[in-house]
Every structure is written in structure tokens, then in C-alpha cells.
């Protein structure tokens, strides 16, 4: 299917870091300053210009180093405004981020929605919307990077804004699938589709390959439109799966409890271990303590003294293993991802003779791992985005390894199915988005019940809906 471009054209961002606002290469005085003396501008026009430059600086710096590493000093120097001017306009950097995000998300949602409603059928509407988004991403890659990744690590208000934007897009697609937004709260299809599209887009934006998205719009549309408009019987609402976004459930484990589960494994006291075993134990305790603290307080609340105290090691021992708290975080992230991939691979390989059964076993094992290791799951799938670009690179490498188990699906696909080349990558993104959803909303205890539906959504583009549904029902029956 060839994507038809929408009739609308993406509007140029008034406050994006475009060439007409810059001079020279990236540097300390990148954005133009107002002329000194009489310039004929009203106070309102001056403030509008200053706000625009600060938003542009925030967009650029987040794309470069991530939100936690952005300082107000960096913002004022890059935007060419004074600190007093900054604080006259914004209370803090979070308020500036929210302002930039609202501008980008509002324009993006409006542009994509306009393209979507111009289609004559669901398949065409979705593809037109993807083309519209790809055009914006190519025109404003740094702004789109902020929209997809920049809110992580910025606090609950930023995540709340992001969730509202995601829900608006989900509702648009859900309505286009000729379904009531509230009629089937257990259907994860729309979240899965949004996750796949977001993953493909975010990866290319972060890697400086935004121009590829326009060419991929048709493939993503074909992938998304391969899913039937209704879930097969026996999957919708089965095993008590819920996809709602109404916050933590009454039985969800709070952050402190997630941390204590990890902390409870930490040994202490005298021992007769060899030096190598001691070092291994210390490293494991530091990793587990890091995951426990981040589960409770987030990356921003992570401190070396608390890591050392909970891990029952000295500060000197900590520094022998990790130079900074960021390195400890990356160490914990690698351990969590390695464990998740290991249990997935072992389950997959045990049933590899029948690829679809191996995938089902792997997804079931992955969801079981997430449920049993809530602190590590939260760190690797949620907190990673707000830590640093290095953490996101580690995540992308792990996701690429996970995608490798899906690629044989192209070979196993029936002759009548021609899955687009982007399918494996998009499906992997969809799986991780659903995991992210359950973890973020403190619903990990329900995730194992979602495994059959995840299996169906994973297999459908490769095997078709019949075998995908049969495999998913078999998994659901085995858990009864």
C-alpha cells in the first residue's frame, strides 16, 4: 500500500529551534538576541520572543542530553536571556518543559487528527495520520524527540500530560476502529499499535534518522491495519486483563513495597566466602539496592550514601565498583534486562521447533518475570527513559535482541501473508509499550493475565488471526 499524503501541510513551529532562529553551529550563544536599545517591541512581544527562545533551548538540550541533565544555566546561556528573566517567565525548568511540551503535543495532535479524519476508511485514515506525523518528525526532529521521550524523568506532572496526549491518540484510533471508547476496556490492540509506532519513530528520531519515517509510513500503516477490528472470542476480557488508565489499583504494590521485595534478598553479617564470591555478592547487593531505591524515589532520589547503606557496603567498596550513581543505575539496568532476556530466551528455545509456540512461551515467561521482579522491571522499563541517553541506548540494544526472536516469523508466515519489513520492530515496540503501561499504572499483578492477548497481538501479523488466536487461547487455558 502506498501512502497518500494528507491535504494539510505541517505548520512550522513558532518556537522550534529552526534555522531562522539560529546562527552558526550548536554553541553557547546559538539563539538570536533582541537588539539593545530602542527596538520598537512591546513588553508582551519581548516576553513572547524570550519564551520562544527558552522553549527552543529546552527542546535542543533535551534532545542532546536528556531532561535530568539540563540546567537553568544551560538554558539561559543558549537562549541568551538572564537568570532573572528566566524566573520572571517560569517558576522552574519543569514549568518550561511543560510549556514546550504542551505546544508541541497540541500542534502534533491537531495536525495528525486533521489528517486522520480526511481519510475515507480506517485503513486510509491511519496511513494518512502516519504520513502527517512523519512530516512533522522530519521538519522538527528535536521537537518530536521531546514529545516522545522528553517527559520521562521530569516528574508526575509531565508524565500526566504525556498520558493525556497518548489517550487522545488512542481514542482517535479506537473510534476509527468502529468501537466505543468505553465498551471494551480490556482490548489492548490500540495501546499495542501506538507503542509500535512510537518505538519505530523514537528510535529513528534519537538516532538522527527522522527522514526515514516518511518512507516507513506505508509499512507501519499496513502493519497496523493487519489487525482485525475486534479481538477473537475468548481473549477480550479473559483472565481479568484491564487496560484502563485510572491509576494504581487497590491491590497494587506501592513503590515502597516494590523496593522491600528486592531489599529482602540482601544478605549481611559474617560469612566464609572467597574474595571472588564476596565481590560478586557486594555487586549484586548494590544492584538490588539501586533498583529498590529507584522503585521508591525515582532516579532523581537515588544517592550513593543510601545505596551503600542498603547494600551494607562501605562508600569505598561502592566506588571500587561504580564511579557514580549513574553507573550504578546503568549496572542495575543491564542486570534487569539481561535477566528478562534470559528467561524469555530459555522459554522460547524450549519450544522453538514450533515458532509460534516458542513466542507464546517467551512472552508468558517475560510477563511472569516482570510480575516477580517489580523493582527491576520498573527501573528497566520506566526509569530508564529519565536517566540518560546512555540508558536509552542500552534499552535499544536489549529491544533489538528481543526483536531477533520475532524475525523468524517472516519465514513461518503463510504464503498469503506478506508482513511488512517493519513488523518485527513494531511488534517488539508494542509489547514493551503494554509492559510499560501496566508497570507505570501499578498494575503489574494483572500483567500475567494479559499474556494471552499479548501473544495474539504478537503473532497476528505473521500467522494471521486464526493461528494467533488458537495459540493465545491455549496459553490462557494452560493457566486455568
Q: Where are each of the predicted segments found?
A:
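C-terminal peripheral helix-coil segments that are non-catalytic and often amphipathic
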Residues: 1-38, 171, 175, 203-276, ...
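Amphipathic alpha-helical segments used for helix-helix packing
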Residues: 137-156, 170-174, 202, 371-389, ...
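Hydrophobic alpha-helical connector segments
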Residues: 113-142, 345-375
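Amphipathic alpha-helical packing segments from all-alpha helical-bundle domains
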Residues: 155-180, 186-194, 198-199, 215-222, ...
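Long compositionally biased, domain-poor regions of proteins
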Residues: 56, 64, 134, 138, ...
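Short, basic, alpha-helical segments at the C-terminal edge of helix-turn-helix-like DNA-binding modules
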Residues: 101-109, 303-304, 332-341
